[in-house]
Amino acid sequence: MSVNSNAYDAGIMGLKGKDFADQFFADENQVVHESDTVVLVLKKSDEINTFIEEILLTDYKKNVNPTVNVEDRAGYWWIKANGKIEVDCDEISELLGRQFNVYDFLVDVSSTIGRAYTLGNKFTITSELMGLDRKLEDYHA
């Protein structure tokens, strides 16, 4: 099993066959546990590769959310983190030297686990209950 708790094959997902079944159906695993984990799966493209390499794995992981874990899954990037993942498409646009907006980004979003929303030119996936855990944001406010 993987050491990183946010790895793709962490925990029970690293088990196979009977070992997986025994762990999956164990009494202690029949209870729903609260989680603040979010997942973002992105289709690989030049723009997304730039975002992963130049923003997410450097400044973002170091200064914003150190729990971010990125795995190369053939044609996709599998990203898992605790709390939230926020993508500022203005930063990507600046890196690319051309316009890149949140709708361009959404074309490459394959799957998510969490609550996803856009606000302005930012895409966010969060574990928070929007409107309950914290006040809803308004782009025009």
Curated annotation (Swiss-Prot):
Name of the protein: Methane monooxygenase regulatory protein B
Family under the similarity heading: Belongs to the TmoD/XamoD family.
Keyword Transport assigned: no
Pfam families in the cross-refs: MmoB_DmpM (PF02406)
Keywords: Monooxygenase, Oxidoreductase
Known function: The B protein acts as a regulator of electron flow through the soluble mmo complex, switching the enzyme from an oxidase to a hydroxylase in the presence of the substrate.
Subunit structure and binding partners: The soluble methane monooxygenase (sMMO) consists of four components A/MMOH (composed of alpha/MmoX, beta/MmoY and gamma/MmoZ), B/MMOB (MmoB), C/MMOR (MmoC) and D/MMOD (MmoD).
Keyword Oxidoreductase: yes
Regions that span the bilayer: none
InterPro entries: MethMoxRegMmoB (IPR054955), MOase_MmoB_DmpM (IPR003454), mOase_MmoB_DmpM_sf (IPR036889)
A single MF term (Gene Ontology): monooxygenase activity
